[in-house]
Amino acid sequence: EHLTSITAMCKDNNDNIYILDANSRIVVLDSNYNFVKEIGLINGSIDYNNAKGIYFNDGKIYVCNTEGANIYIINTSGELLDTITVPESTLIPTDFNFRPTKITIDPSGYIYVVSDGCFYGALLYSPDRTFLGFYGANTVNVTVASVLTNISNRLFPNVEKHANSMKKVPYSFVDI
């Protein structure tokens, strides 16, 4: 079956390529692009349809199950080893929508996760998967002049001023 919706790729230490297809499968190719195997539904029941990120580290495959709001950690046979879900922390806002799209792991084992629409930065986990906080959090620069201009625009609105009154928010992360 052909790949129809490739959403992400990564490779292991042997240069095997892992292709995440949005149709709940991972296709593995060797370094010469020859088919090795396909990893389908995890344990026959856990679906990663529309997953958007994949990463290989230390014999484990990390699959960002965006719609399912978690990250599956599987072995190369497709067996579920663990799951990362939204962390329970006072640093996480109550309205936070955990939608992991990208993941990477540094040489020390720290895990960085990008969540779709998150303005706080990448979620940072320790090597034992304890949530540490946000990495690379954005700031919005606000000056006294911009606040006064915003107040003026609200008090004396017109079309041009209304266009300038859009709420200033930091950009959301899309990749790591």
Predicted regions and their residues:
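Eukaryotic scaffold repeat domains enriched in small/polar residues
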Residues: 1-176
